[in-house]
Amino acid sequence: MLHSSYSKYILDFNKPSWTSRGVLIQKETYFIRVVDAAKPFLVGIGECSVFRGLGADDVPDYEKKLAEVCWNIEEYKDCYKEKLKEYPSIIFGLETAFADLENEAKMTPFPSDFTEGKGFIKINGLIWMDSQEEMKKQIDAKIDAGFSCVKMKIGALDFDSEVELLRSLRKRYSKEKLQLRVDANGAFSVDE
């Protein structure tokens, strides 16, 4: 039989992070703990990360739903992906907690070179919204770290400044050297 509980934490950002909908200085997150009564010394842990104002599961009853899931973990264990479609962060937290438990609760639910510190996932270097100068510094740091693709969060600066930043990057780095991606995060209306 499984037992589950959760804890809420408020995480303070080291540096304010700009989004198209404002500046984040902190965020709330929840850690789910899942224990199998047959092995009570093993605790699977998963994180349910909520970005208020940005995520699909930013709803008023979020914590109430999480408490219900933890209280009734046996009812959810085999069908949580179907029952919790409106709560993707809870799905992620449960999936990670169950995988961690299956992996003897070593806090590496999906062992790999990445989780062992021997490699990294080379998808793209994420560039947070900031002043043009700070974004250029972030991009240079990502390129120095070996990234050939950067994804820029845009929408916090005025449109012309962001276009100018992209143009200046393209002048400095060819498309063969650097792939540019943008993430507007709802910065523009449908009409724009």
Task: Label the model's feature ranges.
Residues 1-180, 185-187:
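N-terminal capping/lid subdomain adjacent to the active-site entrance of alpha/beta enzymes
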Residues 188-192:
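Catalytic cores of alpha/beta
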